[in-house]
Amino acid sequence: MTTTAKTDDIPIDTVILDIEGTVCPITFVKDTLFPYFIEKLPSILDKFQYPLSNTSASSDDQVLNILKQLPDNITKSSESIYKHFKNLVDQDIKDPILKSLQGLIWKQGYEKNELQAPIYQDSIEFIESFPTKSSTNNKIYIYSSGSIKAQILLFGHVKSTTTTITNEVIDLNPKLNGYFDITTAGFKNQSNSYKKILQEINKSSTPKSVLFLSDNINEVNAAIEAGMKSYIVIRPGNPPIDDDDDGNDDKINHKIIYSLDELDL
């Protein structure tokens, strides 16, 4: 069942956006970012001596400091580290150490222009227009399982869809008010994570003025449980919306949109 996404009760002045499957094709993460990380990982790991437990306690190398957060049985060799991270990627496990390392490797790719984020045009237009659409100082935040560094990189290297100039990118970060990930807010299928975000953005007393958009029904349910408004976003290539974690086919009770153009805010 599809319903028109109109506001009710308290007007919405704050929007929190999920990334993959919501403002960006889900295929970009799984078919571009993840393979890029796996491709570059061996050469990154080859820079160090193993086992890492024998290295000095402190280092200025960001990658090394991330790797040393792993258990000693994993850091005994570059092969064991590679196998560990590849397994996490293959199973799409939201591991904080993995996310931090991915962020650093993706940073190199963005800076070399080997990576550009294919944000949907309707999402670009919404991010550019919503903050100035009202005199009430509308705000936009990002909440993703990817690290905040990775989020900033992604929105700082958005592929332009309105120009014929090769490799031209748009920086949307000036339009965004903040970022949250699983290390700063918690896992996205838990209502306490959204309550924490409400506290951070000073919206605990008016949670209904906050709208969270996601393609994941469990995340939508968690946001609603925390008091926010939340809509399901359906995009081309997204997997079918299954029952929630409790086995309930309650998507018919949610507002569904197929483009951010449908938002009446």
From Swiss-Prot:
Cofactor: record remark: Binds 1 Mg(2+) ion per subunit.
Root EC class: hydrolase
Alphabetized SUPFAM superfamilies for the sequence: HAD-like (SSF56784)
Catalytic activity: 5-methylsulfanyl-2,3-dioxopentyl phosphate + H2O = 1,2-dihydroxy-5-(methylsulfanyl)pent-1-en-3-one + phosphate
Primary location class: cytoplasm
One CC-aspect GO term: cytoplasm
Pathway noted in the entry: Amino-acid biosynthesis; L-methionine biosynthesis via salvage pathway; L-methionine from S-methyl-5-thio-alpha-D-ribose 1-phosphate: step 3/6; Amino-acid biosynthesis; L-methionine biosynthesis via salvage pathway; L-methionine from S-methyl-5-thio-alpha-D-ribose 1-phosphate: step 4/6
Location in the cell: Cytoplasm; Nucleus
Required cofactor names: Mg(2+)
Keyword set includes Translocase: no
E.C. number(s) listed in UniProt: 3.1.3.77
The protein's assembly and partners: Monomer.
Membership in a protein family: Belongs to the HAD-like hydrolase superfamily. MasA/MtnC family.
Reported function: Bifunctional enzyme that catalyzes the enolization of 2,3-diketo-5-methylthiopentyl-1-phosphate (DK-MTP-1-P) into the intermediate 2-hydroxy-3-keto-5-methylthiopentenyl-1-phosphate (HK-MTPenyl-1-P), which is then dephosphorylated to form the acireductone 1,2-dihydroxy-3-keto-5-methylthiopentene (DHK-MTPene).
Record's protein name: Enolase-phosphatase E1
Organism of derivation: Candida albicans (strain SC5314 / ATCC MYA-2876) (Yeast)
This protein's encoding gene: UTR4
